[in-house]
């Protein structure tokens, strides 16, 4: 499956991403709980999720209010996020991925601000980054992205409307798009749009560039669409809602980058930690294969599959974590892929309805693979004392029985 980000009329904002992800099916209560855990450490916030019509279309509006307008240094924010994670979610894989993505988004904002103001990261106080509502926007959007398993799918973005005119800031009246927005979107196709006002925030733009795989001028060839609308605050003469389209791609191939390096100096414990680190940093798959190296020394070949946009970042992680001085890069590898879908299904287990996520693979509308999410199976197994292998077999059978007509 693919995700298409459509900000052709609405522009981009962090709370619009949250609303659109919830509209697509992300669990709003889980998102609110995670947002409050992090954002309340930066200042008191209040979150309200409601349905609102925009241009006659019912949308989900994520309203985030805070009375705290303090600013913080970039390094302070990163350290605080890590401290909160260690305190509340030290072993939660989805949270660890969320925080890694969030830190990338913060870094994008920090670099843009530093270039605009001509200061180093250590010297900057962040007006956009430091506030609790910006922390809420970034954490909430990143967490929802992983809740929907969108990191495993290709993300397209259509040209982004930036708005036009001028905007009043604490530095004076500036043209739209604002300098930080223009800097973040420097490699992104943009249009002015139909309105004479600012409709792109730096936070929304930073989220976009960190999750998009490819920028396209029109919708790709897709079927079986699910649509989510995230409402903006302003009432405009055009649709002020970010549209996210989750769909099956008719294209049967994908492109990825393969990274390889040979290692003979790491212990088994370090290799195990490296495996988890690479996945949490955005790798799609990691394999570690024993081999014999120069002078008959035993070693390992570490192979990583990642999105093209993540290749440089993952390369840096490999070098930092292993000490290797070289990584082989095999770019734009084409792979044949089945149409894939991530769905939620209610399964009756011993008289109780349990929510189980499935990864479904299709060829010509025929199910060729049906795999329940291990974390869900493990949770149910702990609750029911049913062996995991028996649970997997049972829920797969129940899914196929319940979906024979699909």
From Swiss-Prot:
Keyword set, alphabetical order: Nickel
GO MF annotation terms: lyase activity; nickel cation binding
Origin superkingdom: Archaea
Keyword presence, Lipid biosynthesis: no
Any Pfam family matching the protein: Ni_insertion
Family: Belongs to the LarC family.
Protein name: Putative nickel insertion protein
Record lineage: Archaea, Methanobacteriati, Methanobacteriota, Methanomada group, Methanobacteria
């Amino acid at each position: 499956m693919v995700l298409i980000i459509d900000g052709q009329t609405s522009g981009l904002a962090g709370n619009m991403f949250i609303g659109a992800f919830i509209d697509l099916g992300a669990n709003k209560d889980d998102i609110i709980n995670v947002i409050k855990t992090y954002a309340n450490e930066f200042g008191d916030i209040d979150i309200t999720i409601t349905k609102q019509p925009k241009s006659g279309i019912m949308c989900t509006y994520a309203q985030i209010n805070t009375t705290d307008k303090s600013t913080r240094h970039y390094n302070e924010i990163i350290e605080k996020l890590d401290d909160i994670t260690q305190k509340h979610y030290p072993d939660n894989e989805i949270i660890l991925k969320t925080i890694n993505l969030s830190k990338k988004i913060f870094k994008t904002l920090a670099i843009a601000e530093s270039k605009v103001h001509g200061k180093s990261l250590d010297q900057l106080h962040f007006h956009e980054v430091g506030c609790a509502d910006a922390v809420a926007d970034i954490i909430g959007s990143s967490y929802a992205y992983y809740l929907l398993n969108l990191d495993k799918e290709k993300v397209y973005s259509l040209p982004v409307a930036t708005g036009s005119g001028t905007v009043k800031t604490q530095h004076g009246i500036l043209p739209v798009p604002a300098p930080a927005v223009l800097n973040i979107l420097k490699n992104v196709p943009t249009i002015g749009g139909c309105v004479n006002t600012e409709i792109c925030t730096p936070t929304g733009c930073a989220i976009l560039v960190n999750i998009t795989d490819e920028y396209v001028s029109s919708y790709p060839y897709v079927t079986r669409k699910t649509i989510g609308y995230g409402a903006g605050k302003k009432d405009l003469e055009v649709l002020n809602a970010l549209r996210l389209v989750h769909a099956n791609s008719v294209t049967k191939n994908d492109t990825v980058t393969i990274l390889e390096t040979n290692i003979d100096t790491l212990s088994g414990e370090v290799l195990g930690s490296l495996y988890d680190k690479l996945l949490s940093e955005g790798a799609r798959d990691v394999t570690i294969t024993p081999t014999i190296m120069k002078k008959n020394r035993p070693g390992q070949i570490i192979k990583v599959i990642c999105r093209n946009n993540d290749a440089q970042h993952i390369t840096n992680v490999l070098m930092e974590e292993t000490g290797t001085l070289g990584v082989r890069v095999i770019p734009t590898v084409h792979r044949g892929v089945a149409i894939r879908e991530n769905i939620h299904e209610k399964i009756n287990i011993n008289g109780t309805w349990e929510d189980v996520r499935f990864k479904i693979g299709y060829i010509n509308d025929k199910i060729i693979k049906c795999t329940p999410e291990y974390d869900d199976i493990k949770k149910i197994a702990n609750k029911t004392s049913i062996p995991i292998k028996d649970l997997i077999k049972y829920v797969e059978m129940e899914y196929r029985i319940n979906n024979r007509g699909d």
